[in-house]
Amino acid sequence: ESLKDETVNICKKYSASVILRKKLNLQRKGYALDEAVKEILSKKQKYDAYFIFDADNVLDKNYIKNMIPIFDKGYDLASGYRNCKNGNKSVVAAASALTFSLVNTVFNNKKNKETRNITFSGTGFYIRGYLIEKWKGYPFHTLTEDYELSSYATLNNLTTYYNTKSIFYDEQPLRFKDTINQRIR
């Protein structure tokens, strides 16, 4: 995405697999996820779940360990608790962090208690492998593909869960211009 982005070099340093986008004319996260998932599916390996994270996310050391009991209960999709890495760096970052906190802590906690479907917000969640295989990719491509996924889950009676014990840290944009670019890239 950026000349300063060291993600690929960091991945190579740790011998992680890297999937480089080919269809750069299709902008937005949903298209990037679709391309990556199709590449993974083409290798004909089966996975129990696909975890969706942004490159700048940092997982708590117990994130996966704390997500396993939720997976074992049979939930189709589950989101972890998003904490902010840089909420004190600017007003825009603070507002963004508060928005995610409101959606997750207030709304998703309440939905969990009422056994209603949660609202996914971009990153830090898993999707069961059978769904990815059924979809043959990641079919959510709107500007708010995470809300599209949330709506799909509700309309198709998929089970969702908000897991406050699976913590991850996300970096928020510092300038308003960056929030706009983040949505349309």
Region roles according to the model:
Residues 50:
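Short aromatic/hydrophobic "clamp" motif used to bind/position activated sugar donors
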Residues 164-179:
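Active-site donor/metal-binding and catalytic loop motifs
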